[in-house]
Curated annotation (Swiss-Prot):
It is found in: Nucleus membrane; Cell membrane; Cytoplasm; Membrane, Caveola. Residues 392-430, 474-515 are annotated as: Disordered. This is Alpha-1B adrenergic receptor. GO terms for biological process: adenylate cyclase-activating adrenergic receptor signaling pathway; adult heart development; behavioral response to cocaine; blood vessel remodeling; cell growth involved in cardiac muscle cell development; cell-cell signaling; glucose homeostasis; glycogen catabolic process. GO terms for cellular component: caveola; cytoplasm; intercalated disc; membrane; nuclear membrane; nucleus; plasma membrane; T-tubule. The modification Phosphothreonine is found at residue 264. Residues 410-424, 484-498 have a biased composition (Polar residues). Disulfide bonds join 118-195. The keyword Metal-binding does not apply. One of its GO terms (molecular function) is alpha1-adrenergic receptor activity. The keyword Translocase does not apply. Pfam families: 7tm_1 (PF00001). It comes from Rattus norvegicus.
Amino acid sequence: MNPDLDTGHNTSAPAHWGELKDDNFTGPNQTSSNSTLPQLDVTRAISVGLVLGAFILFAIVGNILVILSVACNRHLRTPTNYFIVNLAIADLLLSFTVLPFSATLEVLGYWVLGRIFCDIWAAVDVLCCTASILSLCAISIDRYIGVRYSLQYPTLVTRRKAILALLSVWVLSTVISIGPLLGWKEPAPNDDKECGVTEEPFYALFSSLGSFYIPLAVILVMYCRVYIVAKRTTKNLEAGVMKEMSNSKELTLRIHSKNFHEDTLSSTKAKGHNPRSSIAVKLFKFSREKKAAKTLGIVVGMFILCWLPFFIALPLGSLFSTLKPPDAVFKVVFWLGYFNSCLNPIIYPCSSKEFKRAFMRILGCQCRGGRRRRRRRRLGACAYTYRPWTRGGSLERSQSRKDSLDDSGSCMSGTQRTLPSASPSPGYLGRGTQPPVELCAFPEWKPGALLSLPEPPGRRGRLDSGPLFTFKLLGDPESPGTEGDTSNGGCDTTTDLANGQPGFKSNMPLAPGHF
């Protein structure tokens, strides 16, 4: 933003938020005047130009990657990511139209493009920075709705509502930034090589409140409420899951007789509810919203760290001359605000595996893996297999691929993950009628996890007298280095009648493993 509040840095103005004094660029025997250009320090100009040029280039490339990541990946086209794209567009516009001229001003020490372009440039500066702040404000409201109303979020925040919110962001930003172009400013200096800031007191108050302090208050209130709601909801959902597990209403592995399965299914239809409780569904959806809130909380936190020093130094230096910081400190403060434009493209891939994969695919490093994931998403199920665990097997965990199953960006359908194949041992197939098995894999399961059926009643401590089923979750058979039976093993995919979510049922008997 253009520091329209600055009344203390006014001697020879670069058009950005801090004023640069001409005597900083003149020799010891030279004086600044309207007719004399400052002497250029070539060494300093080259070093400053290289540093600022690299910074601007990084901001441009990073924000382009953010925009392309959402545009080229259908599963990233969510309302929350629309706000992220809007933030990237504002930062990209700032990097293209404002930062190069700010860097030129730093290198040369005076404005070279005339009075009219100075006014336009300053207005675009305010426009882009205000749009960034208001986008973060919209993101904080979106995250509060996502955490507070996680199940109703898709109906409360639709694509149409998100687009209307983005249009409102740019309209408000235009209203705040256009004032000086319409004459709401003090008289311009006589020297066109000075690009001063607007010191008109009422516009200074209006722009500072609308561009930073009011949106900042909304952001802080929303994220405080997100923290309170997340803490309370997590506690309640975890308590509900523990209660249902203790009542044996929610089992991740159920082995039962065919008659019992049919009776349970018929009673479930009669009662009109699903034995798989909605508590797990709520917990899974809420965990996704909370994870997104954490990532965007980092974005907001870095924004505050970058811009707050400037908005503290600017009004204090304007109102109280004794509190005015040195020119070198003031330059660092306002360029720290500009530095925020290249931070977000670093935060997203570090905090989100989905954005990291999208960045890598755009850069051409994982195109083949991207095709595999897209094909699996079209099939609607993850190709994970299980095998019986036999006597003498060591209780080890194996990670068959680097991507953990808790990533919501791939191989996810609804609220459960499915295990589409079974591989019984040859010796077990000839045993005759065996109970069917029904498997429901939840996102918390990891490749290599060991799943065991509790001991049958009345046989506690007698592991050799009853069929103790133990299974090991293997990795994706399509992934390199993964082993597993990829045949369907007589399994069929069914649908959860209550929730409309894909489930999995297998009538293929599995081999018991004895320790």
